[in-house]
Swiss-Prot record:
Residues 94-192 form the FAD-binding FR-type domain. This is Protein RfbI. GO terms for molecular function: 2 iron, 2 sulfur cluster binding; metal ion binding; oxidoreductase activity. Its cofactor is [2Fe-2S] cluster. [2Fe-2S] cluster binds at residues 37, 42, 45. InterPro entries: 2Fe-2S_ferredoxin-like_sf, 2Fe-2S_ferredoxin-type, 2Fe2S_fd_BS, Beta-grasp_dom_sf, Cbr1-like_FAD-bd_dom, FAD-bd_FR_type, Flavoprot_Pyr_Nucl_cyt_Rdtase, FNR_nucleotide-bd. Keywords: 2Fe-2S, Iron, Iron-sulfur, Lipopolysaccharide biosynthesis, Metal-binding. It comes from the Bacteria.
Amino acid sequence: MSHIIKIFPSNIEFSGREDESILDAALSAGIHLEHSCKAGDCGICESDLLAGEVVDSKGNIFGQGDKILTCCCKPKTALELNAHFFPELAGQTKKIVPCKVNSAVLVSGDVMTLKLRTPPTAKIGFLPGQYINLHYKGVTRSYSIANSDESNGIELHVRNVPNGQMSSLIFGELQENTLMRIEGPCGTFFIRESDRPIIFLAGGTGFAPVKSMVEHLIQGKCRREIYIYWGMQYSKDFYSALPQQWSEQHDNVHYIPVVSGDDAEWGGRKGFVHHAVMDDFDSLEFFDIYACGSPVMIDASKKDFMMKNLSVEHFYSDAFTASNNIEDNL
């Protein structure tokens, strides 16, 4: 059975079956509601239920006035939701295309830069910041796209997760010209048009979508002030010199690496990466912040930044979770 689902304040509607999540129904209808992990872990798809009833994956029933996760809840009745909708993504169509490995380079002890080439007529048409699903040998995992356009294929940053199915395949046997498949574009993490200064907050391979977005801004000769905070446990884990190069070549780009572990060789900033932001700015009222990393980092930074006058409408995030199909994107 299907029900009409209305989204406010954009005043759009679509049909959703009782056996599919609200988010899946929306995406099938070409309506891009805000989301990231699609597994119920990141909380980014949280919406206000204005009318109707839904059931979540555990069988819990929610009604009017409740907050729900659209990736986990299915409609029991007609619904009205207060949820974010992105018309910028309306023209995108998710597709699956073949690709071959161009190169697979180990750039740190546990991170590999994977570059894939697609057929000239099989582009996915992503926005900088979005991600793809990588399919190989019956395993599917999600990875953020690390380059800003498809002219040179697709670049991914893959961390070697202990017992990770996909990362074990990639680190163990991948060779040049290996045939794989990618599905995308996915996600609602992309740059919003604005003249506000930007803070990028990255943890680990959360640098991948940040790289994509910063490259896009630089190529477009953006004059907004750009601050890149990149956190790692140890200084040896920083696997790219690009942020430092950007800061040296562009006077509006500022790079602040932060180390959280006990690292005797590190003479720079120490502690949690979002604490460095807190220390550097008295107020975040006029900033746009893009955060990409673990759900713990994103939750902590969002709460703390709001104490520095950041409006929740100007906090954009993409959480790398270890559940379901994105365990190797941490």
